């Protein structure tokens, strides 16, 4: 049930990409993301898993993942935070968020691929494809290390570290918006 809201959200992917051009919009989304990540640490934790989690809670977590089409919003962080608010065990919520993250990335690849096909493959060369394949492989290896680090950080400190990072980045983006 978590994947259901994510797939339709990516039909809005092309519409929301223009928000990334506005530093003010990005800084506001980063402030919102920091709040989404920070607030759940003050709520009681639960121990729900697949046996006790309702479909509504799964849909709510999926809506958090669907919010990742907005620049500055972390889909995985939003899913885990919403799951935590609903009483889902953080570790279980993180594992599900990672699984849904694969669907999110697949939808992104499909949308970007459709954009390339609509453009008529102009400028696509073998060296460009090879570069993208190597970059994809390197990002896969980096993601594996990142997942292990993320699991350890969430288990020990929740998402408060990432919330402060988002707020600092939001202030920096807001400052750049004022200067530009």
Please provide the spans of the model-predicted regions.
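Multi-pass membrane proteins that catalyze or facilitate reactions on polyprenyl-/lipid-phosphate substrates
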Residues: 1-180
